[in-house]
Swiss-Prot record:
Enzyme class: ligase
EC number of the protein: 6.3.4.4
NCBIfam families listed in its UniProt record: PRK01117.1 (NF002223), PRK13783.1 (NF010355), purA (TIGR00184)
Leader peptide range in chain numbering: none
GO molecular function terms noted in the UniProt entry: adenylosuccinate synthase activity; GTP binding; magnesium ion binding
Binding site for substrate: T298, T299, T300, G301, R302, A303, R304
UniProt organism field: Thermoanaerobacter pseudethanolicus (strain ATCC 33223 / 39E) (Clostridium thermohydrosulfuricum)
Localization of this protein: Cytoplasm
This protein's name: Adenylosuccinate synthetase
Gene3D superfamilies reported for this sequence: Adenylosuccinate Synthetase, subunit A, domain 1 (3.40.440.10), Adenylosuccinate Synthetase, subunit A, domain 2 (1.10.300.10), Adenylosuccinate Synthetase, subunit A, domain 3 (3.90.170.10)
Family: Belongs to the adenylosuccinate synthetase family.
Entry keyword annotation includes GTP-binding: yes
Chain's role: Plays an important role in the de novo pathway of purine nucleotide biosynthesis. Catalyzes the first committed step in the biosynthesis of AMP from IMP.
């Protein structure tokens, strides 16, 4: 590893947190490059669980530099709460760095998110209502407020006053809703500014210098390929770019500085919220995966929709992110199933297609074409090598490799760090 990007290959919730945590031990720097506190992951260390939303997983290692890049949108209240919770658990945050170019989430973003979802009725997108989308909207509209603005009281006052007036007018005229008090918000965010100020720096300079000096850098993505604003199942997507290409913009480095890309593949497929899901299961197998895999959102607590592994999706993810190898997670969840399936193509308009369609209307009409595999009953959570796995589990993994054209580098067989089979060193 010199620079390694970790991306989700499905609709998020692939287990990136555990893989990042595992690889972070060998990295010098861990960077978050997109999204906000709409994503979450749970990392275990020495039997203790840590729930993270904004701060990179590397924070659990005091010697690692952890960077929140310019592509992340930061809710200061959420960030400060996360910092304080880690400190209460005895975790140092001294090596946390926050980009001065990152955009700030405000209460009016959260309210706008909620009101827009309500106004869409049955056509709502199922957002986390954390204000992420509206914050990125303001960024695109060039009225966003950045961390560097927050640290200059007069500049911040001018920009916030303009935005509060604009948003209050929007809430009243479009939604018939109450607005916000400028002074109250201004004072509250000045308090936040003082608390985050020690962590703020130009992370583009810092990161460039770290890479040039030979440091090992791990880029930690949130969400997954199919939630990408351009390449995901639009409009049921997030407002940022959780693919490898998002790193260059969201962390402020050039594409030639990326050496490898690891795709995280859950051994089955899950999705939160609305939108087509070709391999979704509505039977006892779907319930089995949900309960055994504890498929409930870290951020929202929402039950995840569950289905069989979809190789069409995985091939698409490999292609658009240039993935070089993959980590397979939650293989142990499949233990106990008599039969396991992998979708190898879609039946659409009387023919078989193997490329992921752009149109959601087309995707909704796609019927999965499956290959069926025998399952296994053996407990695999103690497996230390590939050969320790049951033959049927090995066969399942090898078929995934054949279907998507890249090799597995890591296999996760349980939630603990030591329940990890490493096939390739980094």
């Amino acid at each position: 590893m010199s620079t390694l990007v970790i991306v989700g290959t499905q609709w998020g919730d692939e287990g990136k947190g555990k893989i990042t945590d595992y690889l972070a031990e060998k990295a010098d720097v861990v960077v978050r490059y997109q999204g906000g506190n709409n994503a979450g992951h749970t990392v275990e260390k020495e039997g203790v669980q840590y729930k993270l939303h904004l701060i990179p997983s590397g924070i659990l290692y005091s010697e690692k530099i952890c960077i929140i890049g310019n592509g992340v949108v930061v809710d200061p209240a959420s960030l400060i709460e996360e910092i304080e919770n880690l400190q209460k658990q005895g975790i140092s945050v001294d090596n946390l760095k926050i980009s001065d170019r990152a955009h700030i989430v405000f209460p009016y973003h959260i309210k706008q998110d909620e009101l827009e979802e309500i106004s869409k009725g049955k056509n709502d997108l199922g957002t986390t209502k954390r204000g992420i989308g509206p914050c990125y909207m303001d960024k695109s509209e060039r009225i966003g407020i950045r961390v560097c603005d927050l640290l200059k009281p007069k500049v911040f006052e001018e920009k916030l006053r303009r935005n509060v007036e604009k948003k209050n007018k929007l809430f009243k005229e479009l939604y018939g809703a109450e607005g916000f008090d400028f002074e109250e918000m201004y004072q509250k965010y000045l308090e936040y500014a003082e608390k985050i100020k020690p962590f703020v720096t130009d992370t583009t300079v810092l990161l460039y210098d770290l890479i040039k000096s030979g440091k090992k850098v791990l880029f930690e993505g949130a969400q997954g390929t199919l939630l990408d604003l351009d390449l995901g199942t639009y409009p049921y997507v997030t407002a940022s770019h959780p693919i490898a290409g998002g790193v260059t913009v969201g962390a402020g480095i050039g594409p030639t500085m990326i050496d490898e890309v690891m795709g995280v593949v859950k051994a089955y497929t899950t999705r939160v919220g609305k939108g087509p899901f070709p391999t979704e299961l509505f039977d006892e197998n779907g319930e089995f995966l949900r309960e055994k895999g504890h498929e409930y959102g870290t951020t929202t607590g929402r039950a995840r929709r569950c289905g069989w592994l979809d190789a069409v999706i995985l091939k698409y993810s490999v292609r658009v992110s240039g993935i070089t190898h993959f980590a397979l997670t939650k293989l142990d969840t499949l233990t106990g199933l008599k039969k396991i399936k992998i979708c190898t193509g879609y039946k659409f308009n009387g023919r078989i297609i193997t490329d992921f369609p752009a149109s959601l209307e087309d995707l909704a009409q796609c019927e999965p074409v499956y290959e069926e595999f025998d399952g296994w009953e053996e407990d695999i959570q103690g497996a230390k090598t590939f050969d320790d796995l049951p033959y049927n589990a090995q066969k399942y993994i090898r078929r995934i490799e054949e279907l998507i054209g890249i090799k597995a580098a890591i296999i996760s067989v349980g939630p603990e760090r030591n329940q990890t089979i490493v096939l390739r060193d980094f």
